[in-house]
């Protein structure tokens, strides 16, 4: 029983650490970043989601490695933002550039795949788009 308690405590601690650097989604911040021509990475999460914590850990590292990008996230339970961004699942990762969604994935936690998507968005290669029909803040 003691081992189970310790395991649960460790898992909760890991999730808290992974989510500690999050920047909550704000329409104002999003629109300002887009108007300034910045790339915006948006991720959705939900409390007690281990894949969300894994994805957030990768994104926290990306914040250090790709500093000219705006990173935002939101709780997928926020219906207003979920509807605005057409997000139905936690760990949905979106990349926006020039007011267009240029990348979308669900459940991606691989550092190499997430970094590749960010690098392609920086290099103006918009062919990584899975759903480029979304336009926010125009």
Report residues per predicted region.
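Sec-dependent N-terminal signal peptides
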Residues: 4-13
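Non-catalytic, surface beta->alpha helical segment in thiol-disulfide oxidoreductase systems
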Residues: 97-135
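Typically the conserved alpha-helix immediately C-terminal to a functionally engaged Cys/Sec
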Residues: 51-65
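N-terminal leader/targeting and pre-domain segments
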Residues: 10, 17-36, 119-138
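Structural micro-motif
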Residues: 85-94
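Short active-site neighborhood of thiol/selenol oxidoreductases, capturing the structured segment around
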Residues: 35-47
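Thiol-based oxidoreductase modules, predominantly thioredoxin-like and allied folds used
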Residues: 44, 67-80
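Solvent-exposed loop/turn segments at secondary-structure junctions
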Residues: 46-50, 77-80, 92, 101, ...
